[in-house]
């Protein structure tokens, strides 16, 4: 276990459908705003515009570096179908050093060499 001062955390949001949740997840990971996004179905009960509502939704658990929160929030708002999407950040107090190192590397900006390597992998997978 690693006690960390690094600003890693979980960001929670919900989406109206699996399709929307997957699109959000792919965009966040592709843009290196998230290392990983876990998705699962949930049933929510809430008040919206003074009316009690309940709805099946998809919960996204986004693992990220919280210093990226402003850009991550902007991307979620850009892609989200809700007027007021849930966007809540929770810090990670401790975790596996190996996992947290991977998380940090996954959201770090890519070096030019890494971009070329990834592009080559993409080119090979399209053949």
List where the protein language model places each region.
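Positively charged, small/polar-rich N-terminal and surface patches that mediate targeting and assembly
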Residues: 1-127
